[in-house]
Amino acid sequence: MSVITFVNNRKEETGKTLSLVAIATNMAIENNEKILIISTTNKESKIKSCFFEDTEVKKMRLGIFGQNMSALDTEAGIDGLAKMLRSNKLNPDMITNYTKVVFKDRLEVLLGKNKSERNQNIEEKVQSSPIEIADEYVEIVKIANQYYDKVFVDLDYNLNQDIREQIIDQSDLIILNSSQNYKSLKELKENKENNKLLKSPRTLLLIGRYDKYSKYNVKNITRYLGEKNKVLTVPYNTLYFEACNEAGVPDLFLKLKCMIWMIEMQFLWKK
């Protein structure tokens, strides 16, 4: 069991969330493991648009892992889970009651702060403020790690520095995300000697929305930063980025898996 936390190098668009979604989804399809994605944002969640239609009507998707829910219901998410934690009633196996299932027994998502305010009164808005809920994330990650094989944390800057550091400290692997532009890479290099996160052996550098035709390619970036390990990349892909806006990520990855399987079978038949 392990915690894998995705963080940004700086406050900029790096494709951090979409890189996490791609990696976690692929691992869920390829491996027989229980995986949980935790969103820590208090804004409109990109993770939600990757997997779930914005509706309260439940819809069934038939995948290779059986029936699973692809729509949102109003009880799921960090709001309900935080209430259970405050009342000291939260056990590891109860977390799944507050998640949304992408692939049954494979991949689940714990969404961040619920932005819907249609049915909230003033008292409820105060009780479910992002500041109060932020304090619960550290314990939720710790408890989730006792039940799931892998816990992916999408660490957002809306959490205060102390909470962020506590989550990072209990992480087995930290994926530091950066964009491909020179300014970001230069800042990484300048801070490398003084930044505890950059010096940690648990940290890997990842370039999201990667363009292999840029002069800042993975080979040059690795050399420029003096990295011992090759810098990881998640390439820009139009089909994937469109799927991320249409709750189409699960279907896209399943179709790609089937295509790969068919190609492999054709190759075997030819032999």
What are these model-derived regions, one by one?
Residues 40-142:
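P-loop/Walker-type NTP enzyme "switch/lid" segment
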Residues 2-51, 137:
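Walker A/P-loop phosphate-binding motif and the immediately C-terminal alpha-helix
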Residues 209-250:
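Beta-strand-loop-alpha "switch" segments that mediate conformational coupling across diverse proteins
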Residues 6-7, 38-39, 111-112, 152-154, ...:
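Conserved beta-strand segments of the P-loop GTPase G domain that flank and frequently precede/overlap
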Residues 242-264:
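C-terminal boundary of histidine-terminating zinc-finger modules
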Residues 131-142, 189-214:
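P-loop/Walker A phosphate-binding loop and immediately adjacent motor/lid segment at beta-alpha junctions
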Residues 162-181:
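Inter-motif core of Ras-like GTPase G domains
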Residues 105-108, 146-153, 173:
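Loop/turn-to-beta-strand initiation segments
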